[in-house]
C-alpha cells in the first residue's frame, strides 16, 4: 500500500479511523503548555530548596491555596470512581463512551494532588512517616492510605488504555494483557469506589472533628461528623459534569465531536440528582449548625462572617443557591437540561460551588477568631503557590493531550465524525 504523505508523520499511532492535527501544530501546543509547566517547576524547586517560607503560608494559615486546590480537584475527579461504579457495577451501558476520559481525569486529579502535597508537607523527605508511623486515631491516616491506594487503582485502570494504542496492541502479549485488564475492570471499579468513598468522606471528617474551629466543627453519626457524608455527596454531585466540561473543552479545541449529546445529558442528569441529594443534607446541616450547634457553643451565625467581601455571607449563599440549587434544578429538569447553554452553565456553576465549599472549609475556617484576643486574619497566596498549582494544570494538559492524540479514549469519535 502506498503511503499517504498528506497524513501527519505519526498517523500510524492514531486511534483507528480518527484524524488528528499535524505534528507541528501539536508540538507548538505542547510547547505553549510547557511554558506554564516550566514556571511551575521553578516554583516547586524554590519551595523544595528554600522551604515553605517562600510561600504565603504562615503559622496561622497552614492550609491555603494548595489544600483548597487539592480538595477541589479530588472532588471534581470523583467522576472517575462514580462513573466507574455506574458503568461496571450497575451496568449503565451508555457510560462506556465517556468512562475512559473519566478514568484519565481521575488519574490526573489524584496524581496532581499528591504532587502538590509533596510541596505542602514542607519536608517531603519525611513523607513516608505517614505510612510507617501511622496515627490510627487520625482521619488523615485514612486519607493518606486511601488516596495512595486509589491512585494505584487509577494507574491500573489507565494502563490498558495505553496498551490499546494501535501499534502497541499489535503485539499478542500486549493485546492479551490489555484484554485481561478489561475483564477485571469491574473488580477495580468496585475497589476504587470503596477507597474513594472513604477518603472523600475522611477529608470532610477531618474538618468536622476540629472542635476548636466553630465554622467547620459538626456533630455526627457514630464516629463520623456530618461533613464526612457531605463531602462524599458533593463529590459525586460535581465529578460527572466536570468530566463533561473537560470533554466539551477538548471538542472545542480539536473541532471534533467526541461524545454524543445523549451521554453528556445522562451524566448531567446523574450529577444533578446527586447534587440535589447533597443540597437537602447541606441545607439541613447549615440550619442545625446556625440555630443549634453555634448557640450551644456561645456563638452566633453572624460571628462566622465579616461585612467585607473576602469572608462575607455572600459565599455561603452563592454556594447553596446560585451554585447549588440553580444548577441542580437545571440538570434535573429535562427541558432545561437539553438546552446546551443552560446545561453547560449549570455544569460550570456546579463545579464553582464545590470549589467555594472547599475554600471556605479550608481558609475561612482558619481566618475566624477563636480566642478573645484574636482578630480576623487574611491570607493571600503568592506566586510560588500559584506557580505550583498552574504546574499541575499544565501537567494534566500535557498528559491529556498525549492521551487524546495516541489512545482510543472515545469509542464514538470515528462514528460521530464520519463524513
Swiss-Prot record:
The keyword Nucleus does not apply. It is found in: Cell inner membrane. The chain crosses the membrane at residues 23-43, 61-81, 98-118, 143-163, 176-196, 221-241, 270-290, 316-336, 341-361, 383-403. It is a multi-pass membrane protein. It comes from the Bacteria. The keyword Transmembrane applies. Its main location: membrane. One of its GO terms (cellular component) is plasma membrane. GO terms for biological process: anaerobic respiration. It holds the Pfam family NrfD. Keywords: Cell inner membrane, Cell membrane, Electron transport, Membrane, Sulfate respiration, Transmembrane, Transmembrane helix, Transport. Component of the respiratory Qrc complex, that catalyzes the reduction of the menaquinone pool using electrons transferred from the reduced periplasmic cytochrome c3, and which is probably involved in sulfate respiration. Is likely essential for growth on H(2) or formate since the periplasmic hydrogenases and/or formate dehydrogenases act as primary electron donors for the Qrc complex. The QrcD subunit anchors the protein complex to the membrane and likely interacts with the quinone pool. The Qrc complex is composed of four subunits: QrcA, QrcB, QrcC and QrcD. Can form a supercomplex with the [NiFe] hydrogenase HynA1 and the tetraheme Type I cytochrome c3 TpIc(3), its physiological electron donors. Belongs to the NrfD family. This is Menaquinone reductase, integral membrane subunit. It comes from Nitratidesulfovibrio vulgaris (strain ATCC 29579 / DSM 644 / CCUG 34227 / NCIMB 8303 / VKM B-1760 / Hildenborough) (Desulfovibrio vulgaris). The lineage of its organism: Bacteria, Pseudomonadati, Thermodesulfobacteriota, Desulfovibrionia, Desulfovibrionales.
Amino acid at each position: 500500500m502506498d503511503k499517504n504523505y498528506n497524513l501527519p508523520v505519526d498517523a500510524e499511532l492514531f486511534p483507528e479511523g480518527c484524524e488528528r492535527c499535524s505534528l507541528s501544530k501539536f508540538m507548538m501546543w505542547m510547547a505553549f503548555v510547557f511554558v506554564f509547566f516550566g514556571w511551575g517547576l521553578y516554583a516547586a524547586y524554590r519551595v523544595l530548596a528554600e522551604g515553605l517560607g517562600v510561600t504565603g503560608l504562615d503559622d496561622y494559615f497552614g492550609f491555603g491555596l494548595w489544600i483548597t486546590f487539592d480538595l477541589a480537584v479530588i472532588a471534581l475527579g470523583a467522576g472517575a470512581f462514580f462513573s466507574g461504579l455506574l458503568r461496571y457495577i450497575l451496568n449503565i451501558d451508555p457510560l462506556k463512551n465517556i468512562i475512559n476520559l473519566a478514568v484519565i481525569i481521575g488519574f490526573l486529579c489524584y496524581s496532581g494532588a499528591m504532587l502538590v502535597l509533596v510541596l505542602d508537607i514542607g519536608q517531603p523527605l519525611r513523607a513516608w512517616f505517614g505510612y510507617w508511623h501511622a496515627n490510627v486515631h487520625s482521619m488523615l491516616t485514612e486519607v493518606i492510605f486511601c488516596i495512595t491506594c486509589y491512585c494505584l487503582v487509577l494507574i491500573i485502570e489507565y494502563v490498558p488504555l495505553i496498551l490499546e494504542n494501535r501499534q502497541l496492541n499489535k503485539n499478542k502479549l500486549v493485546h492479551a494483557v490489555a484484554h485481561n485488564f478489561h475483564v477485571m475492570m469491574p473488580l477495580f471499579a468496585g475497589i476504587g469506589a470503596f477507597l474513594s468513598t472513604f477518603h472523600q468522606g475522611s477529608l470532610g471528617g477531618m474538618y468536622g472533628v476540629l472542635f476548636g474551629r466553630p465554622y467547620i466543627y459538626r456533630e455526627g453519626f457514630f464516629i463520623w461528623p456530618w461533613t464526612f457524608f457531605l463531602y462524599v455527596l458533593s463529590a459525586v454531585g460535581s465529578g460527572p459534569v466536570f468530566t463533561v466540561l473537560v470533554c466539551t473543552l477538548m471538542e472545542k479545541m480539536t473541532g471534533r465531536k467526541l461524545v454524543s449529546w445523549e451521554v453528556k445529558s445522562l451524566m448531567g442528569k446523574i450529577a444533578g440528582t446527586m447534587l440535589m441529594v447533597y443540597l437537602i443534607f447541606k441545607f439541613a446541616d447549615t440550619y442545625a449548625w446556625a440555630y443549634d450547634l453555634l448557640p450551644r457553643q456561645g456563638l452566633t451565625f453572624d460571628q462566622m462572617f465579616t461585612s467585607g467581601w473576602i469572608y462575607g455571607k455572600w459565599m455561603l449563599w452563592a454556594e447553596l443557591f446560585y451554585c447549588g440549587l440553580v444548577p441542580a434544578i437545571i440538570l434535573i429538569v429535562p427541558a432545561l437540561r437539553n438546552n446546551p447553554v443552560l446545561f453547560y452553565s449549570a455544569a460550570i456553576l456546579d463545579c464553582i460551588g464545590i470549589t467555594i465549599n472547599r475554600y471556605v472549609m479550608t481558609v475561612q475556617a482558619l481566618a475566624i477568631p477563636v480566642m478573645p484576643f484574636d482578630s480576623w486574619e487574611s491570607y493571600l497566596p503568592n506566586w510560588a503557590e500559584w506557580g505550583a498549582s498552574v504546574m499541575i494544570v499544565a501537567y494534566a494538559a500535557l498528559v491529556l493531550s498525549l492521551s487524546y492524540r495516541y489512545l482510543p479514549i472515545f469509542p464514538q469519535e470515528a462514528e460521530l465524525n464520519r463524513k
